[in-house]
């Protein structure tokens, strides 16, 4: 199943970094999933720039703290 959405990651100054995500997660874990989990594809973008990408293997590691936070949220939700 594909899921798409937006996560607002607090910056600390009362503002948020907007992280758009696209995630493909299955009902069962897979050898191709992140940490052998259910997510097989995941893209995170901030202002149109890819800040994380996993497509059955890590392509772009988290580029900043907002990407790391969004990744943790999505891992909890879908993996």
Regions found by a protein language model. Give the residues of each.
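Generic low-complexity segments that are intrinsically disordered, proline-rich and/or Lys/Arg-biased
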Residues: 11, 30, 62-63
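A short, structured beta-strand/loop element
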Residues: 20-56
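Mixed-charge, Lys/Arg-enriched low-complexity segments
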Residues: 46-79
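Negatively charged, low-complexity tracts enriched in Asp/Glu with abundant Ser/Thr
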Residues: 1-27
């Amino acid at each position: 199943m594909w899921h798409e959405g937006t996560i607002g990651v607090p910056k600390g100054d009362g503002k948020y970094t907007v992280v758009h995500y696209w995630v493909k997660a299955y009902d069962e874990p897979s050898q191709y999933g992140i940490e052998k989990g259910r997510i097989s594809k995941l893209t995170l973008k901030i202002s149109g720039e890819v800040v994380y990408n996993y497509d059955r293997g890590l392509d772009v590691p988290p580029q900043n703290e907002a990407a790391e936070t969004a990744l943790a949220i999505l891992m909890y939700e879908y993996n």
